[in-house]
Swiss-Prot record:
It holds the Pfam family Kelch_1. Involved in pinching off the separated nuclei at the cleavage furrow and in cytokinesis. Required for mitotic integrity and maintenance of chromosomal stability. Protects cells against mitotic errors, centrosomal amplification, micronucleus formation and aneuploidy. Plays a key role of midbody function involving abscission of the daughter cells during cytokinesis and appropriate chromosomal and nuclear segregation into the daughter cells. One of its GO terms (cellular component) is cellularization cleavage furrow. It is found in: Cytoplasm; Midbody. It comes from the Eukaryota. The gene is KLHDC8B. SMART domains: Kelch (SM00612). This is Kelch domain-containing protein 8B. It comes from Pongo abelii.
Amino acid sequence: MSAGGGRAFAWQVFPPMPTCRVYGTVAHQDEHLLVLGGCGRAGLPLDTAETLDMASHTWLALAPLPTARAGAAAVVLGKQVLVVGGVDEVQSPVAAVEAFLMDEGRWERRATLPQAAMGVATVERDGMVYALGGMGPDTAPQAQVRVYEPRRDCWLSLPSMPTPCYGASTFLHGNKIYVLGGRQGKLPVTAFEAFDLEARTWTRHPSLPSRRAFAGCAMAEGSVFSLGGLQQPGPHNFYSRPHFVNTVEMFDLEHGSWTKLPRSLRMRDKRADFVVGSLGGHIVAIGGLGNQPCPLGSVESFSLARRRWEALPAMPTARCSCSSLQAGPRLFVIGGVAQGPSQAVEALCLRDGV
């Protein structure tokens, strides 16, 4: 591990993946990191499946996915990993749903999505899988909400989202699923909505104050954060084209309102298409794209207690468009784009005792 200004954090570098990829689907189950599908050097979706044994730090090849895909969603259900939606070799959204049985090392097909979709957001609650939104073969954003019942191997429809979108950020908090942002075609969505799992009703919350694509979102200590991104031109914006920003907007779930933090509390670097997560009372922003000609390697954290940004140790491998996954005190940053699809697997970790 390496340390720097952020003494509470360090990077752990794992052996590189056998297959370089971007838009891979990742899951963590029983101390194994699974990386499924994605796009390789040729730019086409892969059926390749690999797993990293966290104890031995060795990679193993798994049985290939029945359906090659990129940008799929994954949910862990006990000893199974369910893979939902994504895009296929002809750049068309897929309806296929497949489960990898960890103990048996094989794939099984499951009930397909009612409609093919890419950019589906998924949440697991009490053994049920909720799939929200997506983009269909007609490129139109979807408002559908479906719930998968593993025992019956079927999808059931729930009340639709008020705002159709794909690629949204979702957070489970209490008995509600919060859905933030996403896209409609090339346009970023500012909607912020919540689905009550008990009442099965939707609530519209105040929209994001600013319209940004490729922003990073995280939830911590009862607040939702929206960071950075590409700011879109608008009537109160003198820029004629999208530009990188270091904006920080925070929604207080208790008070139900957004706060746009002042310049002194913005991120140190302007960035988009980056990894964001919550570790040990900090919101962390990792890599991405900025005004430089190559991906960023810088990392920073916002201390919720001290209300300030601090520089953290830089990424060992600067990248953007990474897959990410949080498992305990580790935030994994997997694959992505450096000078092409990357094999790098690294994790930002909390030091022991912090």
